[in-house]
Regions:
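Structural motif
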Residues: 40-45, 80-85, 105-107, 149-153, ...
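Substrate-binding groove of N-acetylhexosamine-processing glycoside hydrolases
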Residues: 1-21, 26, 49, 233, ...
Length: 690
C-alpha cells in the first residue's frame, strides 16, 4: 500500500518497534524478564520517572511483556535506577544484571536514562527479554552529539525527541533568526527547550543572526547584545550556539576579503561589486577573534556556561597558514568545530574526486581537519567535528540515511583516533537533513564508548539481528556492494548540487528549458533551484582535455556505482520473504533506499552522457544525426529509470524528502520530470532541423 506524503513522520514517532521478540531458549548465564518483574520509579516526576514509563512501553510493545511500575525498591525481581557519580567519567552508565535485580546506574539522571536505553538495546540484540548476568558498561567518548530534525525543519514532536535520545545523541539544533523565529516559521524556543530537557537533550541555537557591525565600531556591544544577549535573555535554556561563517559573517576589516556581507556585495545588475575577493564568511579573517569576544561576552552575561561553537566550514579550502593563524588567536574558552572530510582529493576508479561537501565517499579525515585538530590541541581548545555520524550526507540528498555500514564504521574508527590523539570531544552528527534512527545510529551508539569495542563484531550483530543468522553472509555481500558503490562515487560539486541532491526527479534539459524552475513545496527553506541547480554544465568539457577526461571518467564510474547499488538491493530483496513479518517492513525500506540510491546514480550517469551529447551539438562536433539519436536513447533510458523509481517513493514517503527542501524527489516531481523529457522527445528531438 502506497504511503501518502509525510507518512514517514508517523514512523519517526514510533520510539519502540513492535513485536521484536523471537521464540528462542534462554541461554546459559542469562535471566529472563517476565511479567513477574517490576520497574521502580523515583516518583518525583523527573526524567527517570519518564524513563521508567518509556521502559515499560518498550517491554510491552517490543517484547510483549507487561511490567508494573512501583515505588517499592525492596522486593526481588526489580529493575531500578541508581545515581553514582563515582561510576566513571561524566555521563558513564551501567546495566548491572543479577538473578533478582537489574540496576540501571548512571553518573547523573541523564546517564541513568541511557542505561535504560542500553537495556533495550541488549534485549533487541537478543531478540528476547533476556539479559546476561554481567556488568554492561558504557562511557561515551563525546560530550556532545548534536543533530537537526529529520521530521521537518526545526520541528521536534515529543516522541521524536525520545527516539533521538535512544540513539545516544544528547543535543538537538534549531535554526535561529530571532527570538522564537526560525527561517520558515515561528514557535516557542522555550517550549522546545523544556520538552527536549525533559528527555535528557540539550538544545543549541544555530545562528542565522545578521552581524552588520564590526566589533570595534561605536555601539557594537549594544548591537550584539540586541542580537545574542537578547536571545539568551529570552531563552536562557539554550545550551550554546553554533557560529559558522556563511550564516554569521560580519563586515571584517581583513584586506583579503570584500569587507561586506555576501548579499551586500551584489549590485543592482545582480553581479558582484567586488569580484576578486571572498566575503568575510569564506575567509579566516584576522578579526574573527575580536568578533567572537563580543559575542561571547554578551551571551555569557546571560548564561555563563554557554557553549560557543565556532565552525571553520567555509574556509577549509584556504591556505593552511592563514587558517592556523586564526586558530592561534582564538579564545580558548570556546569550542572549535572542523568539518571532517572536506576539500580532500583522491582517485575513484582512476578518476579525480574531491570531497567538496559532506560525503561518506571519503570516510577518513582530510588534511584541513587534521591541521586544525592539531592546532586546537596545541591551544587546548575543545575540538568538535562535523562528521554526519547519524548516517546522512549530500552524496544523495533525499534519503533518510546512506546504508553503507562499512564506510560509516571506518569513519567512526577515525573519529575515535582523533578523540585519542587530539581530544575530539564533540560531533555534529548531521546537517539540516536531520536524523533518522537506523542501523547506522545503532552502530555509532554502540561504538562510541571508551571500552574499545570491536566495531566489526557490533556490525555483525546488527546484521544478524535485522536479517537473521541464516542470511548473514548474503547480507554482508549486499552491504559490501553498497559500501563499494558509494565509495567509488566520483564527487563533483555540480553533481551534489544537481542530480545527487534530488535523485531521479532531476530533469535532463536541452535548449528550450534553460530557465527551468524545479517544482517545490511553497514556503520550504531551500526549495526550487536554491540548492539544486537544473542547469548542468562544465566550464569547457569538450574543449579542455582534462575536463573531458573528468566527464568521461565520471560517466564510467557512475555506471559501475549504480550497478553495484542495484545488485546489492536485489540481493537484499531476495531475502525479504525469509524474514519474520515483524522485520520485513524495515528491511524492505533498506532495500528501497539502496535501490533509490542506485537509480539516483543512474540518473547522474545519464545527466553526464546527455550533457556530452548536447554540447557536441553546440560545438558541431561529429555526426549530428548520431548525437540526436543518442540523446533519444538516453532520454528513453532515463524515463524508464524514473518510472522504476515510482514504486520506491510510493512505498517509502521519506524518499524524495529532505527537511529544508521538503519534497523535491517524490512522485509528483518525478512525473513532472518525465513530462519534461517526454516534451523534449516529442518536440525538440522530433524536429532535428531546429
Amino acid at each position: 500500500m502506497a504511503e501518502r506524503s509525510y507518512d514517514f513522520q508517523q514512523r519517526l514517532l514510533q520510539v519502540h518497534r513492535p513485536n521484536r521478540r523471537a521464540e528462542k531458549p534462554l541461554g546459559e548465564g542469562q535471566i529472563e524478564i517476565t511479567s513477574r518483574w517490576r520497574i521502580v520509579a523515583p516518583g518525583d516526576g523527573g526524567l527517570l520517572d519518564r524513563t521508567a514509563a518509556d521502559l515499560q512501553d518498550y517491554f510491552k510493545v517490543s517484547m510483549g511483556v507487561e511490567l508494573q511500575i512501583t515505588p517499592e525498591t525492596g522486593a526481588d525481581h526489580v529493575i531500578f535506577y541508581e545515581i553514582d557519580p563515582a561510576l566513571g567519567k561524566a555521563e558513564s552508565y551501567r546495566v548491572a544484571v543479577s538473578e533478582t535485580a537489574v540496576r540501571l546506574i548512571g553518573t547523573d539522571p541523564r546517564a541513568a536514562a541511557q542505561a535504560s536505553y542500553l537495556l533495550e538495546d541488549l534485549c533487541n540484540f537478543e531478540e528476547a527479554p533476556y539479559l546476561s548476568l554481567a556488568f554492561h558498561d558504557r562511557s561515551p567518548i563525546f560530550r556532545c552529539r548534536m543533530v537537526h530534525s529529520g521530521y521537518a525543519e526545526d520541528q521536534f514532536p515529543d516522541e521524536y525527541l525520545r527516539a533521538i535520545a535512544h540513539c545516544g545523541i544528547n543535543s538537538i539544533l534549531v535554526f535561529v533568526c530571532d527570538v522564537d523565529r526560525s527561517p520558515t516559521h515561528s514557535f516557542s524556543f522555550n517550549d522546545l527547550i523544556a520538552r527536549a530537557n525533559a528527555v535528557g537533550l540539550d538544545v543549541y541555537a544555530y545562528s542565522y543572526l545578521k552581524s552588520r557591525i564590526h566589533p570595534d565600531e561605536e555601539g557594537a556591544e549594544a548591537f550584539y547584545d540586541g542580537l545574542y544577549g537578547k536571545l539568551f535573555r529570552a531563552c536562557p535554556g539554550f545550551r550554546g550556539v553554533i557560529l559558522v561563517g556563511e550564516s554569521v559573517e560580519f563586515p571584517s576589516k581583513d584586506p583579503h576579503t570584500t569587507g561586506r556581507l555576501r548579499l551586500d556585495n551584489i549590485g543592482p545588475d545582480g553581479q558582484k561589486i567586488i569580484k576578486d575577493k571572498p566575503s568575510p564568511g569564506w575567509y579566516p579573517c584576522y578579526d574573527y577573534p575580536q568578533w567572537l569576544d563580543v559575542v561571547k561576552r554578551v551571551i555569557r552575561r546571560e548564561r555563563p556556561d554557554a557553549d560557543i561553537v565556532f565552525w571553520t566550514y567555509n574556509w577549509g579550502y584556504q591556505p593552511e597558514k592563514e587558517r592556523l593563524a586564526l586558530i592561534e588567536h582564538l579564545p580558548t574558552d570556546i569550542s572549535l568545530q572542523v568539518t571532517f572530510e572536506m576539500f580532500e582529493d583522491g582517485l575513484r576508479q582512476g578518476v579525480p574526486s574531491r570531497s567538496v561537501d559532506y560525503t561518506i565517499t571519503f570516510p577518513d579525515p582530510g588534511k584541513y581537519f587534521i591541521s586544525e585538530a592539531h592546532a586546537a590541541k596545541r591551544r587546548s581548545i575543545p575540538l568538535y567535528a562535523m562528521t554526519n555520524a547519524a548516517g546522512t550526507t549530500w552524496d544523495v540528498g533525499v534519503v533518510p540515511y546512506i546504508p553503507t555500514p562499512g564506510l560509516w564504521l571506518r569513519r567512526f574508527e577515525k573519529m575515535r583516533t582523533y578523540h585519542e590523539i587530539c581530544g575530539l570531544c564533540g560531533s555534529m552528527d548531521g546537517h539540516h537533513y536531520g536524523c533518522t534512527p537506523s542501523m547506522i545510529t545503532d552502530l555509532s551508539k554502540a561504538y562510541f564508548t571508551e571500552n574499545d569495542p570491536d566495531g566489526e563484531k557490533i556490525l555483525e550483530r546488527i546484521l544478524q539481528r535485522d536479517w537473521g543468522s541464516e542470511n548473514l553472509e548474503a547480507a554482508k555481500e549486499a552491504f559490501a556492494l553498497f559500501d563499494a558503490g558509494v565509495y567509488d562515487l566520483v564527487v563533483e560539486n555540480k553533481d551534489q548540487y544537481g542530480p545527487l541532491r534530488i535523485g531521479p526527479a532531476y530533469p535532463l534539459v536541452l535548449f528550450e528549458d534553460e530557465k527551468i524552475q524545479l517544482p517545490c513545496v511553497p514556503g520550504s527553506h531551500h526549495g526550487g533551484n536554491l540548492i539544486c541547480l537544473p542547469h548542468y554544465k562544465y566550464r569547457n568539457a569538450l574543449r579542455d582535455p582534462a575536463e573531458r577526461a573528468q566527464l568521461d571518467g565520471g560517466i564510467r564510474a557512475l555506471g559501475v556505482c549504480a550497478e553495484r547499488m542495484l545488485k546489492g538491493a536485489a540481493i537484499l530483496r531476495g531475502l525479504l520473504s525469509t524474514l519474520p513479518q515483524a522485520k520485513r517492513d524495515e528491511a524492505a525500506r533498506i532495500v528501497g533506499i539502496g535501490e533509490f540510491i542506485g537509480r539516483t546514480f543512474l540518473t547522474t550517469h545519464h545527466v553526464k552522457r546527455w550533457y556530452k551529447e548536447k554540447m557536441a551539438l553546440v560545438y558541431n562536433e561529429g555526426d549530428r544525426t548520431a548525437h540526436l539519436a543518442e540523446l533519444r536513447r538516453i532520454a528513453e533510458a532515463e524515463i524508464a529509470n524514473a518510472r522504476a523509481t515510482l514504486p520506491l517513493v510510493d512505498f517509502d514517503s521519506r524518499l524524495g524528502f529532505e527537511p529544508s527542501m521538503d519534497y523535491m524527489g517524490h512522485r509528483q516531481n518525478i512525473e513532472w520530470k518525465i513530462g519534461v523529457m517526454r516534451r523534449i522527445l516529442d518536440e525538440e528531438l522530433a524536429q532535428p532541423e531546429k
